[in-house]
Amino acid sequence: MKRAITIAIVAGIAAVGCDDKKATNLAPAASSLAPSTVAPFAKTMKFAIDAKSSTSIDMPAPKEHIKAGTDAATGTLDVDFTNLASTRGEVKADLTTLSTKTFGDADKDKTQTGHARTWLEVADGEEGKLPDDVKATNRYAVYAIRSVDKLSATDLTKVAPTKDGADEVRTVSATTHGELLIHGHKVERDADVDVAFHYAPGTAADKPKFLTVKSKTPMRATLADHDVKPRDGFGKIAKGAFNLLGTKVAEFADVTLDLRANAQP
């Protein structure tokens, strides 16, 4: 009898240890990110992220290759044209617009889209309704820029323009270092990007109309870091669907940015 009790205690301790190990996979919890602000002495122009900016999401798993995306965003960028390394800003992708395009079948893609939004707790499921404050809290995937380096040019005014239709364009490549917040958990992430500044013909280098930001390589988000897992319509963990992770649903998502930001007066 004593031996049985001892075994049970040891098993219980082991189980707790496993749970603790799983818990440590979670990234630090956060409801928001600290503002991404430029240095006080920097001379910057503000750009507003165009509402139609988008992301593409690629999730290859052994049994299913999920393809998805978002098509709404918000945020701002503050750009110092003569010292691009001083650029700061925040981009927020609207996860309520996330849609999958895995199957090429409207009904199947609609169902999969519903599941994805439920896992992220940004929309009600087929059964059940999430509290509005939970959906509002999780609505955006947020990336805040903390530093910029590996610039192909640090001074935009010294970059020779090229032609793109009627526009003149000055392009630089860079690596941004920042924080990524998804589903209440934040991680540090880098983004390798190409930034193209568009001008009316003959316009000064510090007077662009808008800029675009496109990923050179995807930014990876790991589901476990952000506590993204199977959930029902009430936000409860759907343990019966855990076998999908790593088989039909990849354990990570590769995110590609396609942003436009318009110069502000």
Report residues per predicted region.
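Sec-dependent bacterial lipoprotein signal peptides
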Residues: 1-16
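Low-complexity, acidic/polar, glycine-enriched regions of mature
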Residues: 18-265
